[in-house]
């Protein structure tokens, strides 16, 4: 199981030999520094602890600074544990962990929209816009909770109402790695990834491969990438 933390740069497109444009997300991966190694004998599980995104010392408290000093590492903003990954303390995980043609899972927080109305949040229909309709064009309307008898005198949990929208942890599975630029610490992934520009993205090698890349143009593009990389070596 291969895992990396990266930063979403934005989206672009790559072109196949026939001129087909393929949408791609660009991820910048600063080398992930291994800070500690968890073992079954000592900790009850096997994992490695990595640090990502170098920051100034004044941004962290003394306990965290001591942890980084013990690992002989620069201060990092994010600390994450990866299970089923073998590495030594002080090692650096780079984009070279992945290769073109591989399928990965991308996990990130979606864009936050704050407190949002029911029309945008739940795709409700708007009220009548004709003359005499009054103000409530974007109101929720009746939520079908009556008074007395067999009808509930409360609002059920899960009722679709205005509220916080977005900033949810979402995993997009089986995304294709189009290209890996090791010199620039960049990785290009086919399709979209949750989150705004600058958000932190967790990349993992796919566990459950639901499909095989069947687009012949994309397959040829990956084959040409592989042959060119072998020629450069």
From Swiss-Prot:
Presence of the UniProt keyword Lipid biosynthesis in the record: no
Keyword Ribonucleoprotein among UniProt keywords: yes
Disulphide bonds in the chain: none
Keywords: Ribonucleoprotein, Ribosomal protein, RNA-binding, rRNA-binding
BP GO terms, sorted: translation
Gene Ontology cellular component list: cytosolic large ribosomal subunit
Gene Ontology terms for molecular function: rRNA binding; structural constituent of ribosome
Alphabetized Pfam families for the sequence: Ribosomal_L3
Superkingdom in the source lineage: Bacteria
HAMAP family named among the record's database cross-references: Ribosomal_uL3_B
Subunit-level organization: Part of the 50S ribosomal subunit. Forms a cluster with proteins L14 and L19.
UniProt record similarity statement: Belongs to the universal ribosomal protein uL3 family.
Role summary: One of the primary rRNA binding proteins, it binds directly near the 3'-end of the 23S rRNA, where it nucleates assembly of the 50S subunit.
Name recorded for this polypeptide: Large ribosomal subunit protein uL3
Organism: Ureaplasma parvum serovar 3 (strain ATCC 700970)
């Amino acid at each position: 199981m291969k895992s990396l933390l990266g930063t979403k740069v934005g989206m672009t497109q790559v072109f196949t030999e026939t001129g087909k444009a393929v949408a791609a997300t660009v991820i910048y991966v600063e080398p992930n520094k291994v800070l500690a190694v968890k073992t079954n004998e000592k900790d009850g599980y096997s994992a490695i602890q990595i640090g990502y995104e170098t920051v100034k010392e004044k941004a962290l408290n003394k306990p965290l600074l001591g942890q980084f000093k013990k690992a002989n590492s620069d201060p990092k903003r994010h600390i994450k544990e990866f299970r089923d990954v073998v590495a030594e303390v002080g090692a650096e995980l780079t984009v070279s962990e992945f290769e073109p043609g591989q399928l990965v899972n991308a996990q990130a927080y979606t864009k936050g929209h704050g407190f949002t109305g029911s029309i945008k949040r739940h795709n409700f229909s708007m009220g009548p816009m004709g003359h005499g309709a009054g103000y409530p064009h974007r109101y929720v309307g009746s939520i079908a909770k009556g008074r007395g008898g067999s009808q509930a005198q409360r609002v059920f949990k899960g009722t679709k109402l205005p509220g916080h929208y977005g900033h949810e942890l979402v995993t997009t599975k089986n995304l294709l790695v189009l290209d890996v630029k090791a010199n620039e610490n960049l990785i290009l992934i086919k399709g979209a990834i949750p989150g705004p520009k600058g958000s932190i993205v967790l990349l993992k090698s796919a566990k459950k491969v639901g499909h095989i890349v069947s687009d012949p143009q994309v397959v040829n593009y990956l084959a040409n990438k592989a042959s060119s990389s072998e020629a450069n070596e």
